[in-house]
């Protein structure tokens, strides 16, 4: 599902590249949320349950 995940703590932007090729930036994601994402058993499931429908986002490609 996910190819790459990056996070900028200063701007609180979570950037995700999906296997389908789409790159999305999720806005105002707290560092604690990013930490939970990265330590979760399944990053894909965590994205669906806690991030995708809860944070504003923009597709950048």
Stretches found by the model and what they are:
Residues 1-61:
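Acidic/histidine-enriched, beta-strand-rich ligand/metal-binding domains
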